[in-house]
């Protein structure tokens, strides 16, 4: 009976979409009718009038396209959930690299997902395969402005995460991580939602404890070139626990270590994307410093599973999500060269300021309390990512993505080994 009720609801929604589409078409017709009358009265200024009409009609065309997709597009398979089990979920930064993969998982699990993104680093095409689906909504919105929506869970991922992007606009990065987090906590308080903050291993800075566990307070330069991101996330964590203690908001905090996979920006300045792109294009692989710095890399699907497990757990203290398998940057460069079968040479450049020398997560807490640990082998994840980057380069060469994503500019500093 419940399934029949759900099917009737879906049919009613589709009927509403048809009515909305017809109303939009009628509106466009009236606009063009007005335009025709104006042209008959006014002989000059045609281009200006036409421009104004295009500005008015453009968003309507986009809406009609979305409505058409809802009838014609084939979506990935979605699990059926009852009203009791289906959650209304908000993902800030949901059109970005990690956010779009999280969107895929939650949609396929049968939940209702609203993605909020200002498209500074997110891309609509990362989630366009869901546009028009009954359970999906995409909102162009900046989290530094308040948002009013009824949800059960909030995954707060919105923030530039690569050095070129957060160094390009450090004030914006700080605002997103402070004011944006404050707005999401306020929303969680108003509607009684649980909030998961996507924090970062950067809160540990250049660590003096190795591997890093959740009790380590960190070693961060508060005025260095990366401080806008590192300290922004530290403040965001502080605000989460202040709201938990004072307002009773349910919070979860994930400290995310280096992650890679499809939908990464090719020019985002992180070591994985840098090395793969350079190897594919036959350019020198640029290593900053000696290459003895270490990192631990996890594939994006492992991270997404960890985020969902943490959200649905009863763990309110911070949890590291990363791969404890440690590699030097030089070893990593040589591995990518081998996987790509590239003849590129390795070029050593001066070390970047405040570049952490060692980074490796202690994930005993995640293993014990969440039953989570990475399962995708490094080479398997890298091969998938290399294939994705190869397709991206081919598409760009054929002008299949218009406009192409713009590379973020850096005011100061150089890319580091994120």
From Swiss-Prot:
Residue ranges crossing the lipid bilayer per the database entry: 18-38
Subcellular location: Golgi apparatus, Golgi stack membrane
UniProt keyword list: Decarboxylase, Developmental protein, Glycoprotein, Golgi apparatus, Lyase, Membrane, NAD, Signal-anchor, Transmembrane, Transmembrane helix
UniProt record similarity statement: Belongs to the NAD(P)-dependent epimerase/dehydratase family. UDP-glucuronic acid decarboxylase subfamily.
Glycosylation (residues): 314, 383
Catalysed conversion reaction: UDP-alpha-D-glucuronate + H(+) = UDP-alpha-D-xylose + CO2
Main location: Golgi
One protein family per Pfam: UXS1_N
The protein's required cofactors: NAD(+)
Coiled-coil region: none
UniProt function note: Catalyzes the NAD-dependent decarboxylation of UDP-glucuronic acid to UDP-xylose. Necessary for the biosynthesis of the core tetrasaccharide in glycosaminoglycan biosynthesis. Essential during embryogenesis for craniofacial development.
Organism of origin: Danio rerio
Chain positions recorded as UDP-alpha-D-glucuronate binding sites: 147-148, 175, 183, 186, 189-190, 243, 246-247
Annotated protein name in UniProt: UDP-glucuronic acid decarboxylase 1
Taxonomic lineage: Eukaryota, Metazoa, Chordata, Craniata, Vertebrata
GO MF terms, alphabetically ordered: NAD+ binding; UDP-glucuronate decarboxylase activity
């Amino acid at each position: 009976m419940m399934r029949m009720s759900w099917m009737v609801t879906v049919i009613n929604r589709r009927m509403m979409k048809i009515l909305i589409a017809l109303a939009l078409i009628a509106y466009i017709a009236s606009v063009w009718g007005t335009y025709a009358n104006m042209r008959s009265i006014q002989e000059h200024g045609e281009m200006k009038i036409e421009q104004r009409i295009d500005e008015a009609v453009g968003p309507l065309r986009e809406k009609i396209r979305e409505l058409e997709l809802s009838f014609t597009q084939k979506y990935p398979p979605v699990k059926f959930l009852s009203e009791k089990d289906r959650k209304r979920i908000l993902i800030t930064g949901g059109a970005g690299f990690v956010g779009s993969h999280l969107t895929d998982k939650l949609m396929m699990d049968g939940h209702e997902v609203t993605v909020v993104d200002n498209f500074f680093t997110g891309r609509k095409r990362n989630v366009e395969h869901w546009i028009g689906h009954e359970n999906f909504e995409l909102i162009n919105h900046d989290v530094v402005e308040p948002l009013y929506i009824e949800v059960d869970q909030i995954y707060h991922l919105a923030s530039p995460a690569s050095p070129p992007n957060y160094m390009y606009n450090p004030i914006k990065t700080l605002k997103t991580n402070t004011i944006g987090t404050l707005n999401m906590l306020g929303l969680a308080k108003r509607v009684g939602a649980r909030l998961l903050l996507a924090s970062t291993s950067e809160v540990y800075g250049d660590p003096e404890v190795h591997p890093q566990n959740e009790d380590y307070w960190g070693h961060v330069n508060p005025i260095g070139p990366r401080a806008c991101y590192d300290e922004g996330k530290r403040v965001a964590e502080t605000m989460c626990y202040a709201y938990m203690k004072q307002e009773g908001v349910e919070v979860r905090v994930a400290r995310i270590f280096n992650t890679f996979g499809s939908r990464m920006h090719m020019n985002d300045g992180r070591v994985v994307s840098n090395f793969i792109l350079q190897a594919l294009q036959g350019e020198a692989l640029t290593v900053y410093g000696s290459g003895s710095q270490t990192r631990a890399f996890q594939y994006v699907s492992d991270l997404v599973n960890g985020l969902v497990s943490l959200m649905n757990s009863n763990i309110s203290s911070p949890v590291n999500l990363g791969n404890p398998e440690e590699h030097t940057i030089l070893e990593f460069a040589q591995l990518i060269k081998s996987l790509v079968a590239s003849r590129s040479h390795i070029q050593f450049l001066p070390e970047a300021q405040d570049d952490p020398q060692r980074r490796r997560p202690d994930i005993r807490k995640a293993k014990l309390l969440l039953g989570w640990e990475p399962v995708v082998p490094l080479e398997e994840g890298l091969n998938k990512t290399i294939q994705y980057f190869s397709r991206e380069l081919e598409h760009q060469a054929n002008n299949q993505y218009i406009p192409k994503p713009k590379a973020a500019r850096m005011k100061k500093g150089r890319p580091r080994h994120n």
